[in-house]
Amino acid sequence: VKQQSAQAQLREAAPAHLPRTPLNVIPAALVSASGFLLFAREDRVSGFLLLAAALVLAAMISRRLVIDLALIGVGLTAMSLVPITTDISTEHMAVMGTAMILAVGIPYAASRFLTKDHAIRFPIRTGQPWTRAEKWYLPAVLLIGYALMPVYMIRTGVYNNWPAVSDPEGIARLFLGTNVLGIWDELFFICTAFTLLRRHLPDWQANLLQAVLFTSFLWELGFHSWAPFFIFPFALLQARLFTITKSLSYIVGVHLLFDFVLFLVLIHAHNREWIDIFLY
């Protein structure tokens, strides 16, 4: 009975594909471009102007389209109004954490209680067992992270964009911040932005546009140098995995495995005698 209930909830969670027109991609792409300006370029004025233009254009096409793009815009706006950094002070974590809650919470609440279509969902228990390939991908993620993250973080010096910590409290704060941000990435870029976009666009278009947002945000956070060359494909794959598994827990698990390696690399990079297990 429980499994049947979970499967029913899973079917309900599938996003409704609304009537589409090829024009939908234009305002959607402008929203994605506004995220690039807001985060990667840190050009707030141009970003907000482009976002406004996208919503005006969307309103000319479809009422439902402008609502869904506006929900994404709310999240982008909430995050763009606070400093997006790796600062782990209590003050900054509270400010950025509040923005993260609003960026996910407002679109979810609007979808659930105002439009009442409940388009945004966070499916944790799907009732579907993971396939063998999905299970094997998890340890593969650790190996990929082990091979990639030390080379990227240390050789480029990008690790300096994160605070150097060596005391227990600092290490705990870094661990918490890294993991919370990883979970939020999946809640907003995949469960919110991608889900809303794919109601109006083919999956491949929605995926490309959310990956631009995902990559732009992490660039502002501190993933500079050649990070977009692996973050963009990672974002594409995460959305694809979510489409296949319909499981938030799975994509969060994948992300947190990468983040665990990132955390260890950061500790080692700032304290070279610690966790000396990496090749770079």
Model-found features: residue ranges?
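Alpha-helical transmembrane segments
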Residues: 18-36, 70-78, 138-146, 207-210
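Functionally important transmembrane alpha-helices
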Residues: 207-211, 215-217, 223-280
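Membrane-interface helix/loop boundary segments of multi-pass membrane proteins
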Residues: 126-130, 183-209, 243-247
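Alpha-helical transmembrane segments and their cytosolic membrane-interface
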Residues: 1-48, 151-152, 173-178, 196-200
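Membrane-helix interface "capping/anchor" motifs
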Residues: 57-72, 198-199, 203, 242-250
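Membrane-embedded alpha-helical segments of multi-pass membrane proteins
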Residues: 44-54, 97-105, 171-176, 184, ...
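Juxtamembrane helix-loop-helix connectors linking adjacent transmembrane helices
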Residues: 87-100, 109-181, 272-278
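Alpha-helical transmembrane segments in multi-pass membrane proteins
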Residues: 36-114
